[in-house]
UniProtKB/Swiss-Prot annotation:
This is Tagatose 1,6-diphosphate aldolase. One of its GO terms (biological process) is lactose catabolic process via tagatose-6-phosphate. The lineage of its organism: Bacteria, Bacillati, Bacillota, Bacilli, Bacillales. It catalyses: D-tagatofuranose 1,6-bisphosphate = D-glyceraldehyde 3-phosphate + dihydroxyacetone phosphate. SUPFAM superfamilies: Aldolase. SMART domains: DeoC. GO terms for molecular function: 6-deoxy-6-sulfofructose-1-phosphate aldolase activity; tagatose-6-phosphate kinase activity; tagatose-bisphosphate aldolase activity. It is an enzyme of class 4 (lyase). Its EC number is 4.1.2.40.
Amino acid sequence: MSKSNQKIASIEQLSNNEGIISALAFDQRGALKRMMAKHQTEEPTVAQIEQLKVLVAEELTQYASSILLDPEYGLPASDARNKDCGLLLAYEKTGYDVNAKGRLPDCLVEWSAKRLKEQGANAVKFLLYYDVDDAEEINIQKKAYIERIGSECVAEDIPFFLEVLTYDDNIPDNGSVEFAKVKPRKVNEAMKLFSEPRFNVDVLKVEVPVNMKYVEGFAEGEVVYTKEEAAQHFKDQDAATHLPYIYLSAGVSAELFQETLKFAHEAGAKFNGVLCGRATWSGAVQVYIEQGEDAAREWLRTTGFKNIDDLNKVLKDTATSWKQRK
């Protein structure tokens, strides 16, 4: 699918000079509150959340090609980011209704693609929970929803980054052996689907197609995939889309994420970058709450910097320019 000149220019603002998207993800809301709540008895305040996002933006965006933030708590951080760092803004409400079947998507009601663009976003990001094996009456609603957002982004001439998280209602633990067995097909089939032109997606933000904790050579316990099988799943993922795609870190450690990118590259996956969140900054949360702002800055300038610098070095050796795919 051909992109407009404006969309291409916007994606360039989100990429480094090599055409690789080395983006920092900090649009976490519910997950961040839960992380913070582990280290304090009272409910995290809006001011606390906003300030932590500002700290991360001030200290780390000089090393990232772009940052993903949410318009609920992240706007002060967007103002604090490095002038050369592009901006993605999240359009979805955080989490999903655990009492309703289907994990249906929902936009932030006060926002639109137009308003996110007016706020300075170079792209709109939307997170969708998707199970290719779910009932069609659930999935047709999700497809229609993504078509609406895609059309909105075309109208505003702003890139649409779709993040897809897979699940299976019959397997409550997506870190389990059972889910590891079905994950490759669920991830790759969802990518194939949302690459169709009708959705007007410009970049896919996706999970790696395997759980690396069950890959031979990485696994500490049970092995679900041999190295060859895992490599084939990465190859199949690359073949599933003509669109640029970037990997999310899914909360794994910085080390495991970097090793995963090396494995993907060796398998032949021509991925175009990352949107890496917790693997880079998660250790700052406890320091911020227990020791305060100055200590958190120090953590970000040392460990946080090392995490993002190591990641950038790995990306240089493993990722390919999105311009080769468009």
